[in-house]
Amino acid sequence: MNPVEKARQKLKKKNAAKRNNLTKILNMESTPEAQSVDNISQSQNDLTKSLTTVPKPKSSISTKILKRKELTISDLIKLIFTCDVHEDDIYIVGGLSKSDFTIKKILYKNANVPKILYTNNYVYVHTDDHKIGELASERSKSRLMQTLSLVDINKYDQESQMILSSMKQACEIVRKKQIPLAQENIDTNVERILSGENSSASSVTSEECEQDVMDEQSAEDNEEVSQEIIDALNAVVAPVLENDMDSTESGDIGTELISMFAGQIMEYFSSPLAKENMPEDVLNEEMELLDELEAKVYKIMTASTNKVTKLLLQSAHNYYQGFSDNEKRNLLSRINDLLNPLIEYADKLIDNFCQLYGPADQPITAIGKVLNIAKKIVSVNGLNTNLKLKNGKFILNAE
């Protein structure tokens, strides 16, 4: 058959198909067009039925799992993969990971108080009265931020308030200042965020980042105190500088310092930077760092406690020069009472840090860098050289 005949036969078949299809349409047979009309009618019937029918309550697998006091990894896998988290008594807030292989609920005596459940990938908040959130994944960071803004942290105990407050603070910072995804910009951009500057992926070059790292290493032993730290310290030691010492609460200093520390750490791990995949050799190196995490955090907190002690003693000595020896002894005793809770908070922080921020099955990028940043935030380096007390306020030395 020649090419012309082939083309003619092909056109003939095509025209025949068109005629058959037209005949079906005219006769309202089962064509796609006719089926769409039937589907519309069926959808209307289904809608009417759904509006007049009360749905039967159902018990989902996620409901059964979440009602347990402890969850296993297999339970968690079932929960995540079923994604069946829409029940009225299950509300979820996205969070960070916990390194333990057993997920434990924090149980409260009051049934109306929300219950926090830490998992490998999320923080589940379970409440009996109203919905405050939903499942937050990598694609729903904005939902996480909105959800956290609805959480009434006053319903929680002090430790949980600290964690949620830090999460809200970190999410707000991440929302306002988008952290770039470029891996080479981690150091510079985190530093700029801490200093209050806007950061963008296009504004920082690799050369600038390398120079910043070199400058930081050279100045590691003699870091300056930023205005942000000074402002926080002024807020922390305000009760000490007040004449009415009876108004001082023993936990204020510990709460403030831990919030500063945990908030900035949470900021880093809330960013996309902490979620990037790493090569196996890098992962192994990070896991080795995780083994040293608890000791490093405790060392940082111990050093911070000592420096805050010196800071408070210095402020007390300068501010209360006219006090008698007996009054000074009473003051020092009160200062010690203020600092003791800080040590207790440090122990809690270590536990929370390892549980929330140190997953056993996922990599954490630049954990050593984060600890260095935390050291900057919490500790007061260069206290004797560039931090001075003037008129009851701490200021940078102008010299």
Curated annotation (Swiss-Prot):
Residue ranges of the region described as Disordered: 197-224
Polar residues composition bias: residue spans: 197-206
Sequence ranges of Acidic residues compositional bias: 207-224
Protein name: Uncharacterized protein S8
Organism: Diadromus pulchellus idnoreovirus 1 (DpIRV-1)
Taxonomic placement: Viruses, Riboviria, Orthornavirae, Duplornaviricota, Resentoviricetes
